[in-house]
Amino acid sequence: MSTGADLKAREGDIPSDNMTQEQSFKKGFCSLRHGLAFILHLCNFSIYTQQMNLSFAITAMVNTTVASSQLNASTERPPTNSQDVWNETLQESKAPVYDWTPEIQGILLSSLSYGSFIAPIPTGYVAGVFGAKYVVGLGLLISSVLTLFIPLAADAGVALLIVLRVIQGMAQVMVLTGQYSLWAKWAPPQERSQLITIAASGSMLGTFLVLIAGGLICQALGWPYIFYIFGGIGCACCLLWFPLVYDDPQNHPFISTGERRYITCSLAQEDCSLGWSLPIKAMVKSLPLWAIVVSYFCEYWLLSTVMAYTPTYISSVLQANLRDSGILSALPFMFGCVCIILGGLLADFLLSRKILRLVTIRKLFTAVGVLASSGILLPLPWVRSSRSTTMAFLVLSSVFASLCDSGALINFLDIAPRYAGFLKGLLQVFSYLAGGIAPTVAGFFISQDSEFGWRNVFFLAAAIDVVGLLFYLIFSRAEVQDWAKEPTFTHL
């Protein structure tokens, strides 16, 4: 195994023309590592469309009287015209409908989370030990194929559909967690923010597209086609993934010598070798790791609240109909998709030009993202009379929140690249924990008092996010921790 000193020595032996070629790979987007970011962008896009498609399709899948009663309970002004369109569409498309109670619908929508909560840590460990190519690829393939079979499973019975969704949740975690083991091998430190944010922006784009097109697909083609279309897109992504993606640049058959050398030399100071053992005791005692964990939980509390209740807030408080609610709910994700990439580019620019240190960049982007996004949400209850002002605040909150993806949310790769897959799995558990608790608490507040409930929801989410920020600012670091380095042995 090559050490950092060996790699430095080899770098010194590189001829000047090769060094010039190597320098050229520091600029531009025509490289295999950026190609990997684009493919992962498509993978994340596919996974998030598959996560959200049932939320839209279930309105058309259930008996219209059940759907109508749910709609009347969740909005102040039921959009009767939109409901008539749904009824006409169901009759014309002849898609099957089911007499699922609200309780069964809730279990179906939650079943994906059951699998997602179980799988992250073992998935991250397996990806870190055996490599991420087949972990991510198989996860995407399984999730996509199961998406295609959802209409058949629904016909077979609700129990089979629940089991299918649990397995699908586990498969999706394989993609969302395992990909970070790839970045530990492929992302030079000075490009880490932009590469990861390009890939992560696929989740925003997927959410945006489902919010925009999900209802239209169900209306025009029938609800089964929302599963056929997005499941088919996922299968198509697998055709790109397996032949083009490799676990590391050393084994990639199509990479140029210059790019391989640039990535290898850039990562020479970091120990990215795969390891079987986990320094659990050292991890538990590591305050920089706890800073990331706490920040993850608190930031996802705010994010989960916004994602879960933005459509409800727009429909009930702003009294938008179904069509307008979908379009307006998609706007924050559209702008967030763009700004998450711009934030990554800005972070890497500040680092490559040595304007700021890496730890300063991580703390600065996290602080701006948390303070601005949470602060903008606080006045929402007082501007509810203006739809344009409310939407402007929601969009701005999403824009600033995207900066955290270049801050605390990728900081674990800085402190322990060797255990990137395992740590991402651990952090996913805390994010799912926040995602399970936050909407429940928000629902309790809103049910108690519709006017002051929203105010309490936003204040609580902002307060939790700021507390997490303070903990992160105090204890976070950006250098590789001692427990994340490969042990060295002295031979006498």
Curated annotation (Swiss-Prot):
Subcellular location: Apical cell membrane
Spans traversing the lipid bilayer: 112-132, 134-154, 156-176, 198-218, 225-245, 287-307, 327-347, 363-383, 393-413, 426-446, 456-476
Gene Ontology molecular-function annotations: symporter activity; thyroid hormone transmembrane transporter activity; urate transmembrane transporter activity
Alphabetical UniProt keywords: Cell membrane, Glycoprotein, Ion transport, Membrane, Sodium, Sodium transport, Symport, Transmembrane, Transmembrane helix, Transport
GO cellular component: apical plasma membrane; brush border membrane
Catalytic activity as recorded in UniProt: 3 Na(+)(out) + phosphate(out) = 3 Na(+)(in) + phosphate(in); urate(out) + n chloride(in) = urate(in) + n chloride(out); L-thyroxine(out) = L-thyroxine(in); 3,3',5-triiodo-L-thyronine(out) = 3,3',5-triiodo-L-thyronine(in)
Superkingdom field: Eukaryota
Glycosylation sites: N18, N44, N53, N63, N72, N87
One GO term of the biological process aspect: sodium-dependent phosphate transport
InterPro entries on file: MFS, MFS_dom, MFS_Na/Anion_cotransporter, MFS_trans_sf
Mode of membrane association: Multi-pass membrane protein
Tissue: Expressed in the small intestine (at protein level).
Chain spans, region Disordered: 1-20
Annotated PANTHER family: SMALL INTESTINE URATE EXPORTER-RELATED, SOLUTE CARRIER FAMILY 17
Described purpose of this protein according to its UniProt entry: Acts as a membrane potential-dependent organic anion transporter, the transport requires a low concentration of chloride ions. Mediates chloride-dependent transport of urate. Mediates sodium-independent high affinity transport of thyroid hormones including L-thyroxine (T4) and 3,3',5-triiodo-L-thyronine (T3). Can actively transport inorganic phosphate into cells via Na(+) cotransport.
Protein family membership: Belongs to the major facilitator superfamily. Sodium/anion cotransporter family.
Protein name: Probable small intestine urate exporter
Record organism: Mus musculus (Mouse)
UniProt lineage: Eukaryota, Metazoa, Chordata, Craniata, Vertebrata
Gene name of this polypeptide: Slc17a4
